[in-house]
Amino acid sequence: MTESVLDYMTRLGRAAREASRVIGRASTAQKNRALLAAANALDAARAELAAANEQDLATGRANGLEPALLERLELTPARIDGMIVGLRQVAALPDPVGAIRDMSFRPSGIQVGKMRVPLGVIGIIYESRPNVTIDAASLCLKSGNATILRGGSEAIHSNRAIAACIQRGLAAAELPAAVVQVVETTDRAAVGALITMPEYVDVIVPRGGRGLIERISRDARVPVIKHLDGICHVYVSEHADLPKAQRIAFNAKTYRYGICGAMETLLVDQRVAKDFLPSMAKQFREKGVELRGCERTRAIIEAVAATEEDWSTEYLAPILSIRVVDGLDQAIEHINHFGSHHTDSIVSENLADTRQFVAQVDSASVMINTPTCFADGFEYGLGAEIGISTDKLHARGPVGLEGLTCEKYIVVGDGQLRGQATV
């Protein structure tokens, strides 16, 4: 009899729960051995990876997959190199598991502190990029978690080939195969099962489009680490160094249009707008960026009229909204109202400006004199990231190794009794 999707996912969940107890107590050396062996396996399997990826690309082309999605799907030699380097970098990172902090004596004589421990089993749901398989697996493994990976159906062959390399790494370190499992079925019911198994899965991390993340947030019976949009702003204040501001704004938008840390709205103080916007607009136009501006912006430069919807749109494309604001207070008000609480930056040489901006902007990352595209786990020194969270509970901002752990209290005594004198 054919196994149902629910039975299949339950089997994966049960195996992951059992494996989580093993990986949770594995030594740092054992986890690093698995990561380094997986890196070597990837290096040795380049031909197999390329062949599997070509199957996915051919299917994608035949099904009319958009060029942008095909580009994300492709495993170029450089991307395989990046996956190998990523595994080795994660192996080199400090292991957060078991770290104890804030041990202190209480008046009763007991000592109280906190220890970092793995979350347990993490479900990762993502779309077309097969390199996410390595990012997710490596971070979960190093942080002592078992993981169930459900990639997009368009990358199924690539993900299977990558998973085979991870399995070789686990075997080399004598760790259970179920520490990292890739969902083999492309049936969408697998996602519904994965997000409703709290007895087996401790947290879900979705990486993909807004529709996917909204569905998971709505239907999950498991905690979710997520962000919906990356509506990021750069505010050029009246105290900005304008040449520096132009470099920052240009990099924030054009470094990569498709990342969640790309600037989508440029806010400019009215006192510097006439000096700043003409040369800024010229540079953006030469790069092919479409400009959409408010009335005050369009009185200074040529731009398409911005609508109310533009202020809350994540373009992920060479399109930029520009608004001239009265000053710092209005810039902060705009960001907190229209933004997605992801990453926002101020360009200013005035300390009072920057302090107010950092204190009042309600975002996971708040930046000073630097482009928003720096919102990245690698740039923050976290190594690879499993995603960026705009939630306020548990993890916020780029989620690296520490974000995949939690803390438990450690209490040490020497015979003290509550409410009684120690004998």
Curated annotation (Swiss-Prot):
Top EC class of this enzyme: oxidoreductase
Domain of life: Bacteria
Function noted in UniProt: Catalyzes the NADPH-dependent reduction of L-glutamate 5-phosphate into L-glutamate 5-semialdehyde and phosphate. The product spontaneously undergoes cyclization to form 1-pyrroline-5-carboxylate.
Pathway listed: Amino-acid biosynthesis; L-proline biosynthesis; L-glutamate 5-semialdehyde from L-glutamate: step 2/2
Protein name listed in UniProt: Gamma-glutamyl phosphate reductase
Native source organism of the sequence: Pseudomonas fluorescens (strain Pf0-1)
Classification via SUPFAM superfamilies: ALDH-like
UniProt xrefs under Pfam families: Aldedh
UniProt entry keywords in alphabetical sequence: Amino-acid biosynthesis, Cytoplasm, NADP, Oxidoreductase, Proline biosynthesis
E.C. numbers: 1.2.1.41
A biological process from GO: L-proline biosynthetic process
GO CC aspect terms: cytoplasm
